Amino acid sequence: MKATHKDWILFNGRIVNTKEEQPMVALEERGFQFGDGIYEVFRIYDGKPHLLDLHLERFFKSMEEIKLIAPFTKEELVEELHQMIEKNQFQEDGNVYLQISRGAQARNHVYEKDLQPTYFANIVSFPRPVATMEVGIKVTVEEDIRWKFCHIKSLNLLPNIMIKNKINEQGYQEAILVRDGVVTEGCHSNFFIVKNDKLITHPADHFILHGITRHYVITLAKELHIKVEEREFSLQEVYEADECFFTATPLEIFPVVQIGDEQFASGERGPITKKLQSAYEESISLFKVTN
């Protein structure tokens, strides 16, 4: 799916037209040299930010974890993001990418305390991937080689990139990551299994990203009276599961139909997955008419 970037972006508090101006960052910007920063991605439906409060809560928590002091309040950032959306006259479905880095200084692992952070946001058109949600994806299994603070939405994504490109060359769309015998999540998504009508997912600790869509799906499951367990589970439990799926902000809920060379379960999305997708769809429809 080809992404289409919109012209107007947010850059350090300004709304800038990239056709007229190309914002620049310093050569010794720590985000550029060290990956010293945080990012966030949130969804837009019909031009309206979805679950923005939850995304920004995580954004600020991640900044707090790395002791990066934001040059804005949450309210100021919300206003700037809305200005960017309005300036683009964006009324479609899409994603907003938001990033902040610590700032520029002479290269040193020890950062200065009074740096001026660099931040920006941009919009990308991205229709809902309905076909993927219906047909499902082929996945494989990989060792989780990431660091031990995966709950921080850091710019440092090199392990994810290495795994994602490896499996892409093999024809897979996502990987089930395993750390010391425990299934954690995917390269860019959270992971769930279903067994005996029970939803099971790794607990929200330091070994996974505390996904907003993950949180939302758990909420929907409880509203549907589907039992949810947040616990560690093994790869063997995955193979023996009735259903499994990934969740991510841009992709919502996408079922697994094949693991490695073998068909998984029925080879189609299961009834619990369908039920959760329907509930998610209904919630989006309600969001569109009430916001």
PLM features: what roles do these ranges have?
Residues 87-100:
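Ordered, amphipathic secondary-structure segments that act as subunit-interaction surfaces
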Residues 1-83, 87, 106, 110-291:
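Helix-start/capping segments and mature chain N-termini
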